[in-house]
């Protein structure tokens, strides 16, 4: 089978209750140029049975890897190693692609916006139906919050250039990875006005566990939620914003 355009990577562990809706949203895509990489950490429920129900429909496009891992980011790194697609998307088992033509719309955007290394859109928060996203830059990543990773398509080669997810961060390694991407001036990042996923905002580890190792590396303003820095940056961007961002980026690179 020729290498697909997209690899959709889903880490799983005892997710039988939510996995069917996720897999159904993938199987019904009008764009079939994808593979599904399911990385299971040793489920003891019906997770793998459910995945195999979709095997006749997906055929060779379904890759199932089962082994113990060191957490979700270790599973995601393994998914990257297994993937053959040009572009990688990571979904939680309790998330789903938003529309049947989502991949088709993303493929069209990428085709019209070359070169690109990272393209991202928006998500719909499932509990409130709120659309979250918009365009990001390094300032927004450092001083406000992260892009929802269910909305990001990474060129696979980035994981060779930038490196894998850092396993010392238990729940926010994707934020660290995005900062590394956005702080690299050689990479091209693009925002697309497309809703990529329906996102279960209460299902992630970041809502239940504090990643102290990662948070202590963020700017003080981000950690404490102080908005004064943002006001100062907006009023005197050339004096404050660039200096603060560069100090943070230099620190990030030195401490990787």
Curated annotation (Swiss-Prot):
It holds the Pfam family Glycos_transf_2. Was identified as a high-confidence drug target. GO terms for biological process: glycolipid biosynthetic process. SUPFAM superfamilies: Nucleotide-diphospho-sugar transferases. GO terms for cellular component: membrane. It comes from the Bacteria. Keywords: Glycosyltransferase, Transferase. One of its GO terms (molecular function) is hexosyltransferase activity. It comes from Mycobacterium tuberculosis (strain ATCC 25618 / H37Rv). This is PGL/p-HBAD biosynthesis glycosyltransferase Rv2957.
């Amino acid at each position: 089978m020729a290498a697909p355009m997209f690899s959709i990577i889903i880490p799983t562990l005892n997710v039988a209750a939510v996995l069917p809706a996720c897999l159904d949203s993938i199987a019904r895509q009008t764009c079939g140029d994808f593979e599904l990489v399911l990385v299971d950490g040793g489920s003891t429920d019906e997770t793998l049975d459910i995945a195999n129900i979709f095997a006749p429909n997906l055929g060779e496009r379904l890759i199932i890897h089962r082994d113990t891992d060191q957490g979700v980011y270790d599973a995601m790194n393994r998914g990257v190693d297994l993937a053959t697609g040009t572009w990688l998307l990571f979904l939680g088992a309790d998330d789903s692609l938003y529309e049947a033509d989502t991949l088709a719309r993303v493929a069209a955007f990428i085709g019209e916006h070359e070169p690109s290394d990272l393209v991202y859109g928006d998500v719909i928060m499932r509990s409130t139906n709120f659309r979250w996203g918009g365009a990001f830059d390094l300032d927004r990543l450092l001083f406000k919050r992260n892009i929802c990773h269910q909305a990001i398509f990474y060129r696979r080669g980035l994981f060779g250039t930038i490196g894998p997810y850092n396993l010392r961060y238990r729940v926010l390694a994707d934020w660290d990875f995005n900062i590394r991407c956005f702080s690299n001036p050689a990479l091209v990042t693009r925002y697309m006005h497309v809703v990529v996923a329906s996102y279960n905002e209460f299902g992630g580890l970041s809502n239940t566990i504090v990643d102290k190792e990662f948070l202590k590396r963020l700017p003080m303003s981000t950690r404490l939620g102080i908005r004064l820095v943002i006001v100062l940056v907006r009023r005197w961007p050339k004096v404050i914003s660039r200096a603060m961002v560069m100090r943070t980026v230099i620190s990030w690179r030195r401490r990787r």
